[in-house]
Design a protein with these regions (language model features):
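Nucleotide-activated donor-binding/catalytic signature segment of Leloir-type glycosyltransferases, i.e.
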Residues: 317, 328-348
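A short, well-ordered alpha-helix in the C-terminal region of glycosyltransferases
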Residues: 183, 418, 425, 432-447, ...
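Conserved donor-binding/catalytic core segment of Leloir-type glycosyltransferases
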Residues: 275-306, 317
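N-terminal subdomain of nucleotide-sugar transferases
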Residues: 1-126, 130, 462, 468-475
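Aromatic "clamp/platform" in nucleotide-sugar-dependent glycosyltransferases that forms part
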Residues: 366
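Carbohydrate-associated surface elements
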Residues: 244, 265
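Short hydrophobic beta-strand element within catalytic cores of glycosyltransferases
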Residues: 383-386, 390-397
């Protein structure tokens, strides 16, 4: 089967949990041919892959959002029929447009995005929306907000569409929209896998963002919900990593009958025999994390600073690359400003080898799905302290029916004292750490094996092939 994986902002450009998962996933399915349709932010990253692509990746199609800002060329006068005008009106007003009509306008008719945005039709629609929703907002603010919202979408709708039997999106958002476009153009089924709930993550970012005009924050949030609604509607199956995520998808409008839970899985044998660190009088804490705002490394630094004031013989090892250069510099500056001792930025390391130096691990993310770093830590019998996000409580405390026991502590996000208290409790007893680590290892061995995950996805592809009369393995 020829499967188009649609990815946004991750593989193969950056390291991280989703990228690691994706690389291993492709390698483990040599029976399928994969096409990567990848969305990046900056065209300067074209071809700059940090992974050596597996041999069963047949093609890579790269699309960069900042290319939309450089659109030029002679604009043509465009006319739209009543059906097209209605679809465009609903797009601008964020009210359930007919996406197949929009795909036809920008794919088959090849209408240039700027031709629409500079057309009388757009200005008429835009005026009506502003009068209805933003009568007291400056015209310039409304126009630039609308343009910056629509231009990337219209640009993506005109993208070259790779041919595939199935379009498998690894998020909603822009990636989900491209998967729907591929489905429409080539009459192929769509699958969706969400590691986190993309729309909720964008909502959190927009609420905190300084670049969004306050009166338009609600519109930006509605925009991302609009994108998710289409792939939830069109997808044959929608997978999530844990039960609460599935519930969120259903609450956001996805048909419950198409929603499946397929947990992450790790290569357990790589971690299960890593020896525990000898008791040397120090407690070593590890954080396998990229330096990125969503990982909230600053709160981790503050919490460790407070812990070190209470317990001098503790060390923190932050293991990961820099995802955001500005944020990375701010993290290093914070360490210097506070005068934090015994904190080591290791950069990217071989986690299996480095795990021998650690007593337990910590994760302070603002948002997560089902973090591989926590699964790997538990597989290596290292308990964890995490924020109460995503699947972390289930991983450490167990889901319904899981009686293995507590394998770590959770704290609310961005609560440095709570994290410091949890780390102090973990530091207090080596015997408790060992017991928790063994519980966590048994949980991973039972529920989170790589082989189980792959079997579930193979079954999903097989079900899709049967339902849509597609080529199947061995045919």
């Amino acid at each position: 089967m020829r499967i188009c994986l649609v990815l946004e902002g991750c593989y193969p450009y950056v390291h991280g949990g989703v990228s690691t998962w994706m690389h291993g996933y492709i390698q483990a399915m040599p029976e399928h041919e994969f096409v990567l349709w990848v969305i990046g932010a900056h065209a300067a990253d074209r071809g700059k892959f940090v992974y050596e692509l597996p041999g069963n990746v047949a093609e890579v199609h790269e699309v960069f959002l900042d290319d939309a800002l450089r659109l030029s060329g002679e604009q043509q006068e465009v006319d739209f029929n009543d059906r097209e005008r209605e679809a465009l009106r609903r797009l601008v007003s964020l009210s359930n447009p007919d996406w197949d009509v929009l795909f036809d306008i920008f794919q088959r008719r090849r209408v240039h995005p700027l031709s629409f945005l500079q057309s009388r039709a757009f200005m008429d629609i835009f005026r009506d929306v502003c009068l209805a929703e933003y009568p007291y907002t400056p015209f310039a603010d409304a126009f630039h907000t609308m343009r910056s919202m629509l231009l990337p979408v219209l640009y993506l709708l005109g993208s070259e569409v790779p041919v595939a039997d199935v379009y498998h999106a690894i998020s909603t958002g822009y990636g989900g929209l491209l998967a729907c476009l591929g489905s429409s153009v080539h009459h192929a089924p769509v699958l969706l896998t969400e590691h986190g709930i993309y729309t909720r993550e964008r909502e959190e970012e927009i609420i905190r963002a300084d670049w969004v005009v306050p009166s338009f924050k609600d519109r930006w949030i509605r925009f991302f919900y609009l994108l998710s609604e289409e792939i939830y509607r069109r997808a044959f199956r929608v997978t999530s990593l844990f039960h609460n995520a599935r519930k969120t998808q259903i609450d956001m409008g996805c048909d419950a009958d198409k929603c499946l839970v397929i947990p992450n899985g790790i290569q357990f044998d790589r971690f299960k025999d890593i020896p525990l660190k000898p008791d040397d009088g120090w407690v070593d804490i590890g954080a396998v994390v990229r330096l990125a705002p969503i990982k909230d490394v600053k709160t981790m630094i503050y919490a460790f600073f407070e812990l070190h004031e209470r317990l001098p013989r503790v060390r923190l090892h932050i293991m990961g690359g820099v995802d955001d250069e500005e944020y990375g510099a701010e993290c290093h500056a914070l360490v210097d400003t506070l005068g934090v001792r015994d904190l080591i930025f290791t950069g990217r390391v071989n986690v299996v080898e480095y795990m021998e130096k650690l007593d337990f691990t910590i994760l302070t993310s603002i948002s997560e799905g089902q973090p591989l770093s926590v699964l790997e830590s538990l597989a290596a019998r290292r308990p964890c302290v995490t924020t109460e996000v995503g699947c972390c409580p289930e991983l450490l405390e167990g889901a319904p029916g899981d009686d293995f026991g507590v394998a770590g502590f959770v704290s609310p996000p961005m609560y440095r004292k709570g994290l410091a208290d949890a780390m102090e409790r973990m530091c207090a007893s080596r015997a408790r750490r060992i017991e928790m680590g063994e519980r966590g290892q048994r949980r991973v061995a039972t529920y989170f094996l790589h082989e189980q995950m792959l079997a579930n996805y193979r079954a999903l592809y097989d079900e899709t092939a049967r339902a849509f009369d597609l080529p199947r393995e061995g045919e």
